[in-house]
Amino acid sequence: MYEYIKGKYIDMYKDYIVIENNNIGYKIYTSGSTMAKLPSIGENIMLYTEQIVREDFIGVYGFLTKDELSMFKLLLTINGVGAKAALSLLSISNVSTLKYAIKMGDEKTITRAPGIGKKTAQRIILELKDKIEIDILEEDDEQIINKVADDKKVLEAVAALVTLGYSEKEANKVINSCDKNNSLEQIIKEALKYLMK
């Protein structure tokens, strides 16, 4: 129904953001990867959207890129993968890394997404492997490996901060501002310094 939404970015919650357009606040569910790339609150943004209607729920899902929206829709074609699971998968890394993991049959990367078990990961790989085109094949393998390693470090650092009592939202925000070239231990130390100010 809606192709996209433009408006002022008002607030962020665990799995959705609020965009104001014509004095109406729209609740837009989105992925962690889109959230990590959003500008400061108060700025104008545009998200490509998909509306999902069920008997007990109506929701709008939005993403910064058409590529992420397309991947979201593709994931929904898999039996057992709903909107929540699709967002979870898109939150473990960027779209390119997820596509690469599916294409390479990398169950380990896919099962890092909360709520995605081994059987679901296998089903995703089986059904989508031949449907996915990966633009990142234009990049060299070293760059791809570095992307996966960076995403893994970010996830582990966020998990460590959550264990220490910080919220996932707070942890993500701080970790994403840290230098990803550092070791996992250095990233956590840098984040803690910032949080303890």
Curated annotation (Swiss-Prot):
Per the record, which residues fall in region Domain II? 65-144
As for subcellular location, the record says:
Cytoplasm
Alphabetized UniProt keyword annotations? Cytoplasm, DNA damage, DNA recombination, DNA repair, DNA-binding
**TM segment ranges:** none
Q: Where is this region: Domain III?
A: 149-197
Q: Which GO terms describe its molecular function?
A: ATP binding; four-way junction DNA binding; four-way junction helicase activity
From the UniProt record, give one GO term of the biological process aspect.
DNA recombination
Short name of any one Pfam family annotated for the protein: RuvA_C
Region: Flexible linker; residue ranges are 145-149
Q: What is its main location?
A: cytoplasm
Q: Which GO terms describe its cellular component?
A: cytoplasm; Holliday junction helicase complex; Holliday junction resolvase complex
Region (Domain I) residue spans: 1-64
Its biological purpose is as follows: The RuvA-RuvB-RuvC complex processes Holliday junction (HJ) DNA during genetic recombination and DNA repair, while the RuvA-RuvB complex plays an important role in the rescue of blocked DNA replication forks via replication fork reversal (RFR). RuvA specifically binds to HJ cruciform DNA, conferring on it an open structure. The RuvB hexamer acts as an ATP-dependent pump, pulling dsDNA into and through the RuvAB complex. HJ branch migration allows RuvC to scan DNA until it finds its consensus sequence, where it cleaves and resolves the cruciform DNA.
Subunit relationships: Homotetramer. Forms an RuvA(8)-RuvB(12)-Holliday junction (HJ) complex. HJ DNA is sandwiched between 2 RuvA tetramers; dsDNA enters through RuvA and exits via RuvB. An RuvB hexamer assembles on each DNA strand where it exits the tetramer. Each RuvB hexamer is contacted by two RuvA subunits (via domain III) on 2 adjacent RuvB subunits; this complex drives branch migration. In the full resolvosome a probable DNA-RuvA(4)-RuvB(12)-RuvC(2) complex forms which resolves the HJ.
Share the domain note from the entry.
Answer: Has three domains with a flexible linker between the domains II and III and assumes an 'L' shape. Domain III is highly mobile and contacts RuvB.
* Name of the molecule in the record: Holliday junction branch migration complex subunit RuvA
Q: Which organism is it from?
A: Clostridium botulinum (strain Hall / ATCC 3502 / NCTC 13319 / Type A)
